[in-house]
Each structure stands twice: as C-alpha cells, then as structure tokens.
C-alpha cells in the first residue's frame, strides 16, 4: 500500500522556484577583532632575566586548546548524552567503486560519489549474475528492504551505475546494495533518460582525465495555493522507502594539461522525460543544488573565475539516447 507524506516547506526550492535560490547570497561570517591585551611594563633587568630563561628552554609549552563545541557522542562526560546518543541519522559507506551516505529515515542514499577514469571503467564483469540485496552495514530497523520495492511500480534505480563497476564481480555486486538504490520511474526515466545521462558521464572520460560524479535524491516542494508543499510517496508495507521527487547529478571534470575544474550541476524530475528534452534544460547553478540538497559539493575547490568553469562551456552537454543499446531490465 502506498501512502503520501506531506510537509509544509519553509524554503522555496521546488520546480522553477529552485532558481530563486541563486539570488540568495551566502552570508560570510563576520570577523570581530579582539581588543588588545595590555600588560604592565616590566623593569629592564627583569625583562633580560626572562629572555635568558626562555632561551634555555628547549621545548615550548603546548598552545591552549579551544573549548570543544561539538561533542563526541561517546563522551562519557557529556551529561546530555549520558545514556546514549540517538544519532546518527546517516551511515557512511565506502565501497570499491563508490562512497555513499545513506539516510536511515528516508531509506534512500543522501549522496553517492564516484571517481571515473578511462582505466577504472575497464573490465568484463556482467550484471547478469548480480542480485539486489539489503545492506548488512545498516542496522536492521533502518534498512531498505527488497520487499519494499515488490510491485511498487518503481524501478530500483542505481546512483552509482552498475556499468561504472565492470572491474570485477565484487565491484559490480556492490552497486546492487539497496544503499545505492532509490525508487525511480522506470519507463522514460531510469531505463531511458537517466541511463543516457549515466552514459554521458562515462563518455566524459574520453576528453577529461578525471571525472568525479555525485548523485542523489531530492525532495522538492510544489506550490499549492499560497503555500509550498513537499509531497512524496512512500513505498513498502508498512510504508518504509521514500520516493524522491527529483534526482541530482553534480559532475566535476579535469584535464591534466589544463588548470582549473569544469563543474556541471543537474536536477531532473523523477518522471518520464521526453528524449528530445535538452540536458541543458536541467542545468542549474551549483549553489542552487547545494541549497536544495543541504549538501556541499567539491568544497575544497576555490570557486572563482579562472579556477572553476562551466562543464557545458568545456564540452557539449547533449545526450546520445542511441548509445543505450541494451535496455535495463524492467524494475532495475
């Protein structure tokens, strides 16, 4: 049985309104200079004695450590968590071909990150021998279950595609953990447009030395009357797995012989998409996707002119739907 979960959204991030996020400038933290500390003057003889003593000390005293503001949940001296830490809400998972963050409440990945090169895409592993499976690394009460997808009407959509993990059977099999899976509309999306986008990302390795891709679900609001509402289906019996309204792919590509980074951010609705729809129609500023997802992408890269350029300015952002010769099996 499917149920609908509704929330009143306080932030406008859905549909066309996601563009409104681009006008929201980030507030930089204000630095306040501390007042100078005045110390009484020392007599000259006392200063000379102190300098001589300091020169004789081979080791300096350790600096004063700042007060710890973020407490470890296992800290026995933390009175608020004396009898246990209720978190985390997410599990971090590191696999052969990807890293992932899994949301226990929504039973979906928060994000899945990959690094693609021409070399690591090579291999002969075949998905025909792989099976979807529940992830034992997630505590049992919070796992996505195989039965949740049974007759749900949705495909089990990969965030890290199986075709990106042909290195060996183990790598291929790891992409079938449900922690790498989200419910996706099958016809016209997972088996078509989304699959073509996955091929586009792989093909970038033909013109870039390194390609990094982060994929994940979004839950965006739509306007109803004068309110913005987040609505998404929940599948399973009892209801267990959230059905995202959208999916994002954030791509960073780099050439060894060129300075800087090319970055593209895309957000696609979880519904049938006409193949004639240009990929660029789903292109968004990186900051807009970050605000919608509550995530930071490639934050170690300085975002300024000359360092970061648009991916679609470096390469043609078009999909070749004919490149997906072999259709994904139904439900996958």
Predicted regions and their residues:
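Domain-level detector for secreted/extracellular nuclease and nuclease-toxin modules, and
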Residues: 1-332
């Amino acid at each position: 049985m499917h149920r609908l979960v509704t929330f009143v959204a306080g932030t406008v991030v859905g549909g066309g309104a996601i563009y409104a996020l681009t006008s929201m400038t980030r507030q930089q933290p204000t630095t306040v200079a501390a007042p100078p500390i005045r110390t009484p003057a020392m007599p000259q003889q006392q200063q000379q004695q102190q300098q001589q003593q300091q020169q004789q000390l081979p080791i300096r005293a350790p600096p004063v450590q700042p007060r710890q503001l973020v407490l470890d949940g296992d800290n026995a001296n933390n009175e608020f968590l004396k009898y246990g830490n209720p978190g985390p809400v997410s599990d971090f998972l590191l696999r052969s071909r990807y890293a992932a963050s899994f949301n226990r409440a929504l039973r979906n990945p928060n994000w899945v990150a990959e690094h693609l090169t021409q070399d690591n895409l090579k291999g002969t592993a075949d998905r025909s021998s792989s099976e979807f499976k529940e992830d034992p690394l997630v505590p049992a009460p919070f796992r996505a279950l195989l039965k949740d997808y049974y007759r749900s009407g949705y495909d089990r959509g990969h965030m890290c595609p199986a075709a990106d993990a042909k290195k060996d059977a183990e790598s291929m099999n790891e992409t079938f953990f449900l922690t790498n899976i989200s419910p996706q509309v099958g016809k016209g999306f997972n088996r078509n447009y989304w699959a073509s986008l996955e091929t586009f990302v792989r093909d970038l390795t033909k013109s870039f030395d390194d390609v990094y891709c982060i994929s994940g679900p979004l839950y965006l609001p739509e306007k109803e009357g004068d309110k913005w509402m987040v609505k998404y289906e929940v599948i399973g019996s009892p209801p267990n797995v959230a059905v995202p309204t959208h999916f994002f792919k954030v791509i960073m590509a780099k050439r060894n012989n060129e300075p800087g980074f090319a970055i593209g951010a895309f957000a696609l609705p979880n519904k049938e998409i006409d193949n004639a729809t240009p990929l660029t129609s789903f292109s968004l500023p990186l900051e807009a996707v970050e605000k919608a997802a509550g995530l930071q992408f490639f934050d170690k890269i300085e975002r300024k002119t000359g360092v970061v350029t648009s991916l679609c300015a470096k390469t043609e952002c078009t999909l070749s739907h004919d490149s997906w010769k072999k259709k994904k099996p139904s439900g996958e």
